[in-house]
Amino acid sequence: MDRDLLRQSLGCHGPALLSLLRSEQQDNPHFRSLLGTAAEPARGAAPPPGAGRKEKRVDNIEIQKFISKKADLLFALSWKSDASPPSEVHDDNDNLYAVMPPLEQFMEMPSMDRRELFFRDIERGDIVIGRISSIREFGFFMVLICLGSGIVRDISHLEITALCPLRDVPSHSNHGDPLSYYQTGDIIRAGIKDIDRYHEKLAVSLYSSSLPPHMAGIKLGVITSEELPMYYRRSVELNSNSLESYENIMQSSLGFVNPGVVEFLLEKLGIDESHPPSLMRGLQSKNFSEDDFASALRKKQSASWALKCVKIGVDYFKVGRHVDAMNEYNKALEIDKQNVEALVARGALYATKGSLNKAIEDFELALENCPTHRNARKYLCQTLVERGGQLEEEEKFLNAESYYKKALTLDETFKDAEDALQKLHKYMQKSLELREKQAEKEEKQKTKKIETRAEKLRKLLKEEKRLKKKRRKSSSSSSVSSADESVSSSSSSSSSSHKRHKKSKRNRSESSRSSKRHWSRPSSGHTDQSRKDDCYPVPTNTSASFLNQKQEVEKLLEKQDRLQCPNAQVKEKERGLLTSSGEVPDDLGGRSDFYNSYKTQAGSSKTEKPYKSERHFSRRNSSDSFSRNSEDKMKASSYRRFEKDTEGRKDHSRRWEPSSVKYSTSPASSDYSWKSLEKQKKYTYSGSRDVSKHEQRYQLNTNQGERVYEKEDSCGEGNRNEAPEEMLNSKEQPDSRVKKNLPQNLLNIFNQIAEFEKEKGNKPKK
């Protein structure tokens, strides 16, 4: 209850209204508490003194009875407006609601009453509009024609004047009279600054400070006729045609025809539309059922219209006119979006066309609006099962399973969904088993592929190794060819040295006779070999190029046999130099011991590839034996005598063995000296016949002098005559013939190869 409003009404109407409220609102609990407190001061109040007042109260008895009967509605808080206060400025809202001229214009009221009511209702800060009537030095006077805010009054015929002082007129220039800007007849909008109600005088101002804060943005000053309020323009039209009634003018306005005028005015006045206030008990919303309201009635009406469209669509569907049926269903859903029958019918049409997803959506909407609809549930279950079958064909088993389960949740007794779900589970189990088997097969295939790849890699590695070996052999063959070139160069150098030292040998022939006596000594052979080693330079370490390359070495030996005649001349020349020097070195001591040790070393190297070497030597001996017969026959007799001398010198040469170290001046030279000794021993004992032949030739040279060189020049002719005898010797001793005419540096290389093969044979196999 609004207590303030109740107290105001009781204070106005007195105890008569209080007694009527007690009799009418005795059942209302809100009035029981309020009337008890409000009646006490009324009981003690003195009766009104005049009879005239009693008569006036008697006239108001009907109003008091109306208030007492409708007190629960009149004093309810729901009547209190919660809307913000409307703006007091008159806006041009012609399109929103009907703007009418002032009501007193349609009534016959005297001008004195209008003037009195105007000065009673006018307040400071209100906006007035008028025309300038006269301009004076202290200001200008204006005649009011209408009000710009607040109440609406027709004051154009009242001739009310207002003064605007000079101090309230803003200047429009820095220097000049502010009144010069204004002229008589200008329409001025101004704010009321002061009111003299008794003398009916008004003072206005053109400054915005005279207006209240919520109207401070309004422009004051000169305005045009178009900026006049709408109600004033309507009043001017009404004055020109005074025969028009209030209703005709209201109906002719555009705002009155606006369909949203009620909502606009209710919002502007702050009245709730859901619970509209009414003083008629029959029109109160509490006394009506929900089905009697407009919303429910509208739903019923739209549902009936939608059902008519659905029936027409079903008839089209039975005939086979699916397009027309779809149009009718859509029309029904436009009228009523939640029409269950229209949704079910359209879903069935979608299902027959094959668009199952749309059908499922319509059936689900129908079940949401009406959960007890049988056809919607039934059709939805069938559509879900059919859609699950489609997904199962697409191999989307999980989605199909979800559709089957959804159908079972809607209807647990739906057998089609149960059967489809069981079949799907069985198929999924079988497919899983097949996948596992396929995975196992794939794993096995992968392992096989890996094995085959490993085998291929092994084969490739073997091929690479074989290719590397071939490359090494080719590189070694190239090194052998370079060695051949070096041998040929050494032979050419030996021939040139032979010519240079020819004269020196003649001078040394006499000294060689004296050295002939010392050949009986055991150390004479040792002296020749040590001198031989000193004549040759230290060879380079080329053992790496001859590893496992015996065939190339054998080819090299064959080339050396072809150059045996020049080599024989070089060797005789070297022996002549050695014997003429007269020195007795100690290098040859212990030759038999070195021979035995070399046999063991060479044996290990020869056992690796005996077949190839023997075959090669036999072929080489058979091809080259004829060219060497003449020379071997000439040296046979001297070999026998030299062999006897060497056997006698074995014991004596051991005493000279330690002295061989004296000739080594550096590690490289010492290593070379020991290797040269070993090679000399091998050369001496493995090819003893060659050595004896050389010794015999040396003795002949000492006795005959220059005839040796003539015999060497004719060695080619002797070879032709003595070829058969040399063939026999080559069969008996192939090894001695291979190495008989080689230079000392090649013999050293062969010895290094033999030592390397021995070391390689002694290493443990990995």
Swiss-Prot record:
Residues 35-55, 463-743 are annotated as: Disordered. InterPro entries: NA-bd_OB-fold, S1_domain, TPR-like_helical_dom_sf, TPR_rpt, TTC14. One of its GO terms (molecular function) is nucleic acid binding. Residues 551-562, 606-616, 629-657, 707-738 have a biased composition (Basic and acidic residues). Keywords: Phosphoprotein, Repeat, TPR repeat. The modification Phosphoserine is found at residue 666. TPR repeats lie at residues 209-242, 306-339, 341-373, 381-414. Residues 539-550, 594-605, 661-673 have a biased composition (Polar residues). Residues 497-506 have a biased composition (Basic residues). It comes from the Eukaryota. Residues 475-496 have a biased composition (Low complexity). Residues 125-207 form the S1 motif domain. The keyword Cell membrane does not apply. Belongs to the TTC14 family. This is Tetratricopeptide repeat protein 14. The gene is Ttc14.
